[in-house]
Amino acid sequence: MSLIHMNIIMAFTLSLVGLLMYRSHLMSALLCMEGMMLSLFILATLTALNLHFTLANMMPIILLVFAACEAAIGLALLVKISNTYGTDYVQNLNLLQC
């Protein structure tokens, strides 16, 4: 395993640990998930470049699209919770039930 791959896997692991530690605030959780998605994107891009497989070149782009959708939905939920309750605690998520 090269040093670059090890650094990317370590960045993913640190983002996962950050998500587990700072899960009480929605903004912190969103930032950690974004770090996880970006490290997965870089790892998928490096893998596609190393494989020289034409169909594998679409995988990082698809992953980036899903990351953008996740970020947009998460930020919309953050704005809704912040405007309604004045805080971004994750405990307020079950208050949004119909």
UniProtKB/Swiss-Prot annotation:
Segments forming a coiled coil: none
Name of the gene encoding the protein in the UniProt record: MT-ND4L
Family: Belongs to the complex I subunit 4L family.
Membrane topology, record value: Multi-pass membrane protein
Job of this protein: Core subunit of the mitochondrial membrane respiratory chain NADH dehydrogenase (Complex I) which catalyzes electron transfer from NADH through the respiratory chain, using ubiquinone as an electron acceptor. Part of the enzyme membrane arm which is embedded in the lipid bilayer and involved in proton translocation.
Protein name: NADH-ubiquinone oxidoreductase chain 4L
Subcellular compartments: Mitochondrion inner membrane
Sequence intervals crossing the membrane: 1-21, 29-49, 59-79
